Amino acid sequence: MNIVRKINDELSIAGQITLNQLQQIADEGYKSVLNLRLANETGLLANEQEKTELLGLYYVNLQTQAENINHQGMSEIYQLITKLPKPTLIHCDNSIRSAAIVFLYIAIKQGIGFEKALQKVISLGLI
């Protein structure tokens, strides 16, 4: 089972979540799930969107590859995360993409330029 890591009061990250974890995050008051996984990845939770929405959570699958994170793409992701009901769980297969996206989101929100934040994410080995 993957660990859900709370980053701040608005955002948490995880690898692929299980049905039990999905129920747990709903019980803990999460409002939305952002899935970064690609449709062709292995180990996906079957019917994740349907199961998430049945629990009353907002769900978005924004298929994101780490090597394709760029300024334009991150701008779109930033706007999406900003609009999602909070708290939000952001997950991928092993939480590395999730960590990179959340790091970039927080850095941009704090006024750090995208390029500087991206270099830090790269130096941390997240992408």
Residue ranges with predicted function:
Residues M1-L89, F103-I127:
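Cys-dependent protein tyrosine phosphatase-like superfamily
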Residues T88-A99:
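A phosphate-binding catalytic loop at a beta-strand-loop-alpha-helix junction
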